[in-house]
């Protein structure tokens, strides 16, 4: 059996970290790539590099001759949709330019995308979204990245795949798109202040249909797509497999934190939570939590973004099922499991 070696780009994020953990269970050798690096253990080693620095990237990756699979999950945030294109396309380009010439046994490049491909970030879009849906007006960096891989694939011996999850939930700090942490910290602070748990988004977002993607399920789907012949050179929507409304999920979240539920009250978390660092530090001391800087515990801006969706956010996942991926996760159990793990790791009280 040929030994697989994965290069996981964006290794410190929720998606990359869970993917590495899954690859370890499969017996893969893993190289984690991130700006900050990480601690080597077992079959996992880390490389620290700024992917926007082309020369540094070429230098850092020039010796990765053993790589068979590239899993790309890196992301650079910017203030506007247009500004996202250049850095995110450049990082992917730099990685492929560095790895492809030296990794002579390269089999596959996996690209992590999302519902921005369907225009979910712009407003109400056609649901359930299908992988065959026509593109929307640019800019859209996910589309540019996929088109780049499609061009590079022409004449190459490797294949590609693109995974399109909904909002991804998992354990991870300092991540710009981690809704589970947003909810967990918001609920923990509500309890600390002795106030009920209110949904902070738009009233119509409270009753719209939405779905989530568990980070562990996404890791399994990513490896499946990268190693399955019938999944080559195409994109797949990946979700937990169930739908929910915040109006039904919110009371269950409140019950976990032993909180009462009050009617929704629209607010901008990025503004309302901006002055809560002293409260957080006091909670860390009082409850013996892991000393985590307030800036790393939650992305309030991302919470505002998701809680503003006053329209259904749903994708069709029948394509992946037809191709052979049948994993399913109950979203309520996912949320409660993540919150429990956050408690056990002493990240929240």
Residue ranges and their predicted role:
Residues 4-26:
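N-terminal Rossmann NAD(P)H-binding glycine-rich loop of SDR-like oxidoreductase domains
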Residues 9, 170, 201-208, 236-243, ...:
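Glycine-rich Rossmann NAD(P)(H)-binding loop
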Residues 38-94:
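NAD(P)H-binding glycine-rich loop region in Rossmannoid oxidoreductase-like domains
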Residues 70-72, 83-84, 90-141, 161:
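Conserved Rossmann-fold NAD(P)-dependent oxidoreductase catalytic core, especially the SDR/UDP-sugar
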Residues 134-166, 171:
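Active-site Tyr-X1-5-Lys
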Residues 156, 168-186, 216, 224-236, ...:
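Glycine/proline-rich active-site loop of Rossmann-fold NAD(P)-dependent oxidoreductases
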Residues 185-213:
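A conserved pocket-lining segment of Rossmann-fold NAD(P)-dependent short-chain dehydrogenase/reductase
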Residues 219-303, 316-318, 322, 339, ...:
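Mid/C-terminal beta-alpha module of Rossmann-like enzyme folds, strongest
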């Amino acid at each position: 059996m040929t030994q697989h070696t994965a290069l996981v780009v964006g290794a410190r994020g929720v998606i990359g970290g869970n993917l590495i953990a899954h690859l370890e269970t499969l017996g893969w050798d893993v190289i984690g790539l991130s700006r900050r690096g990480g601690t080597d253990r077992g079959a996992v080693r880390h490389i620290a590099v700024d992917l926007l620095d082309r020369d540094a990237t070429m230098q850092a990756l020039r010796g990765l001759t053993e790589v068979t699979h590239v899993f790309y999950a890196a992301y650079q945030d910017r203030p506007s949709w247009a500004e996202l294109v250049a850095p995110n396309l450049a990082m992917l380009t730099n990685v492929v330019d560095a790895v492809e010439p030296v990794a002579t046994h390269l089999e596959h490049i996996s690209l992590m995308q999302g519902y921005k491909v369907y225009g979910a970030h712009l407003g109400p879009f056609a649901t359930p979204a299908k992988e065959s849906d026509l593109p929307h007006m640019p800019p859209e960096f996910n589309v540019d990245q996929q088109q780049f891989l499609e061009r590079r694939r022409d004449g190459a011996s490797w294949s590609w795949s693109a995974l399109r999850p909904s909002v991804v939930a998992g354990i991870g700090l300092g991540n710009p798109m981690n809704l589970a942490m947003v909810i967990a910290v918001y609920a923990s602070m509500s309890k600390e202040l002795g106030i009920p748990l209110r949904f902070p988004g738009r009233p119509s977002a409270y009753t719209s249909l939405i779905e989530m993607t568990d980070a562990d399920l996404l890791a399994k789907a990513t490896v499946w797509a990268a190693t399955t012949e019938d999944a080559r050179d195409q994109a797949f929507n990946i979700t937990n497999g169930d739908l929910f409304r915040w109006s039904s999920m919110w009371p269950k979240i409140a019950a976990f934190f032993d909180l009462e539920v009050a009617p929704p009250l629209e607010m901008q978390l990025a503004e309302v939570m901006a002055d809560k660092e002293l409260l957080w530090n006091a909670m860390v001391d009082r409850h013996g939590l892991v000393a985590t800087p307030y800036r790393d515990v939650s992305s309030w801006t991302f919470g505002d973004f998701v809680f503003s969706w006053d329209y259904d956010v749903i994708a069709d996942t029948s394509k992946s099922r037809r191709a052979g991926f049948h994993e399913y996760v109950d979203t309520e159990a996912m949320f409660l499991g993540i919150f429990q793990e956050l408690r056990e790791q002493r990240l929240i009280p």
